[in-house]
Amino acid sequence: IWAERVNDVPDPRDSEHLRVVAQQYAWNIHYPGADGKFGDVRVDLVDEQDNPIGLDRSSEFGADDFYTINQLHIPVNKKIRVDLSSKDVIHNFKLPELRVSQDAIPGMNIPVHFTATSTSEEFLETAVGTKREGKSLEIACAQLCGLGHYRIKGYLTIHEEEDYTAWLA
């Protein structure tokens, strides 16, 4: 049963499709832009300050792509497909509140999929009066990935569809 669930990866056309590239010590989130198609990425274009994913903006679909560092934004109640990879060592992409956890392995592209059923705001309202009160939703690394492991922390924001569309614009 579990294998059927995990291996039932949604088609990119039927989901919000993102790429997450892990590295010591950051989560690089690649969004395809308004055309919904990813531009090419090339290792020779990687620049840790200006282009950590090596996005080729001159490629056919690359001009409107963008990326964030440690900031994952997704819509609520929509299938999310993340193509997960790593630039350096094994990391573990973990969204604790969504019960998502998957190793990111150098040289591999691993699809992960999930659907968030409440917005960040709705989820955090349920945390009032608990240890989670006043916190945010996080992206964690659940694999000891080096001396700076404590620094690989990101944030997850789950939006209503119209707010997500506005954020993308």
Protein language model regions, located:
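Non-transmembrane, membrane-proximal soluble domains of secreted or membrane proteins
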Residues: I1-A169
